Curated annotation (Swiss-Prot):
InterPro entries membership: F-box_dom (IPR001810), Leu-rich_rpt_Cys-con_subtyp (IPR006553), LRR_dom_sf (IPR032675)
LRR repeat start-end pairs: 14-37, 39-64, 261-286, 287-311, 312-337, 344-367, 369-394, 401-427
Protein name in the entry: Putative F-box/LRR-repeat protein 23
Taxonomy, superkingdom: Eukaryota
GO molecular function, one term: SCF ubiquitin ligase complex binding
Pfam (any one): F-box-like
Keywords: Leucine-rich repeat, Repeat
Domain F-box: 178-225
Amino acid sequence: MAPHRSRQRNPRFKLWRYDDEPLAIAETMPELRHLKLFGNGLTNLRLEAILDNCVHLVHLDLRRCFNINLLGDLEKRCSERIRDLRRPDDSTADSPFDASSDIYSAGEDDYDFYSDDSDGTLSDHFEECKTVSVATGNESVYVLSFVRSDNFIYPKKIASSSSLSSTPLPSLMKDKKLRNWAELPSKLTSSILLRLGAIEILQNAQKVCKPWHRVCKDPSMWRKIDIDNRNDRAAFKYDLESMCRHAVDRSHGGLIEIEIWYYGTNDLIMYIADRSSNLKSLGLVRCFPITDEGVAKAVSKVPLLEYLEVSYCLFSGESLRDIGRSCPNLKTLKLNRAPEIMFSNSGFDDNAKAIAESMPELRHLQLLGNGLTNKGLNAILDGCPHLEHLDLRQCFNINLVGDLKKRCFERIKDLRCPNDSDDDSDDGSDNGAVTTFGSQFNETDYHWY
């Protein structure tokens, strides 16, 4: 009998969206013998890649992989190569992730994420259904099993060469003596989960099981916060500012590094600064609501800061001087694509002069699209004697000729000139991501239990 469903429903999500996991398997796991991709969205092309690279594969489960079309040469190749082949339309009756489950959904159907009922029955059932077998990208991995739930992969069991070296693989598979990931040591679990972003941890990973939830609440998990919404439009459905505040609270003052794209505000960076006296790295990219005064005020509370990146924010020379005086250890400054609303050459050089006067310890300076002139550049070279990396791309008021050109090339180890390509810049200048935010965020979702 299906567990009782609470009437309250959270948003619905599509199960399968990506084809990159099979490619990663093909590229990094040549020793695979057993591969289960139950309900995966891989295509024929990715299946070919797996067959090309996983040359020892003998068991392949493709049930509910409805993007696969096993016909012609591909069908022949699979049948000849794979000893135990489960096809997309084969029965799932023997699978613990049977498509008839009240929570599991097959094909392109929507997936319902229900809230807990009063006695917790549904929570236990859902936790059981969404835990799956998975292995990390290790060349010695023999057994790998993926079952997709929402857009997140939940691991449960793993077997690698270290655990199989003294046990014949078929015997081990028969007895199902695989490691339960919920029983892994906390340090190892933490090491694995740290590879996820904050969104994945708060929205998914901490809800897998109680041991993972405990690890996800540990302050050591929040030394670095990167709520990366650059290439994921789905991320904008969340209240990212509230999510960021919650992540900062979990750090308990231990936050070292944070990067914010689009959703930063003066209030948010002040909230971070008030609770993160050990902060050493702060990135604010395309956070249009912030002001130079707001950044300077927040930065004054984090004197250990060594790295600061701000883009699309107009800075006055005085605000930059305040930052330099507040952060004597500042080694890297990225001040990119400031709005060009100043018109005189002296105004263009205000930032350069402030940097030269207040940031003598700089090693890395990036000024993409800045309006400084040769005079401002000379001031920086005079005032920042340790400068090794200087990025002047799209600084078209600079004329690198004669003595100035010679001085730059002799002094600067890594020099990017005004006309150099900026294709590799990572300041969001060509990112077309939507800059409006949703609010599908519930603080209780993060605490869970």
